[in-house]
Amino acid sequence: FIIYIATYGFYYLQIKLKSKFNRNIQYGVVGIFLIFVIYKMIIFHPYQNLYFGTLFKNNIHNKFEIDYWGLSANKFLNDVIVLEKNKYPIKIGVASFLTLERSIKILNKEDREKIVIVGQEYQNADYIYTAFISEVDINGNDKYKIPSNFTKIDEFILDGIRIYEVFKRTQ
C-alpha cells in the first residue's frame, strides 16, 4: 500500500514538474534515498529488522522492543561457545521476556548440547543474557533484575542502539 501511494506521488510530481530539469532533481532525490537505504541495510545485516529504529530519537529505544525476533541471541550464543570452548555445560540465565530457545535451534548439534538455559534461576547461571524485553514493568518488578554477583562483560550496540547485554558470574 505504501508503494502504491509513493508511486502515485511520483506520478503526480512528474505531471506537475514537466521540465527536464525538475525531473532530474526528482531522480536525484530518489537516488539519494536509495543510497541511504542500501547503506543502512548493509550496516544492519543480518539485523535488518532493526533498521527503522534509527529513524526515531535515541530515547525511544527504551520504550519499545528492539530485537523482537532474537536474532542477536544467536550472535551471543556463538560468542559464549567460543569463549567457553572447554566448558560443559554452559548455563545461561535470561533476564528478559525473549526466550533463547529459537536461537539455540540455529546452532549445530554439538554446540546445542553445550548450552543449558536456566531461565530466571540466576543462582544456577554462569551467564545472564538480557535483550531489554519485558512483559512486566521493570520499575516495579524485580523479575529481571541482574543479581549483584554478576558483572557486565559484553554489550552489543548497533548504530548507537543497545541490542543486548551479557553478564558473567563473578564468584
Name each model feature, range by range.
Residues 39, 91-96, 129-131:
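Short beta-strand segments
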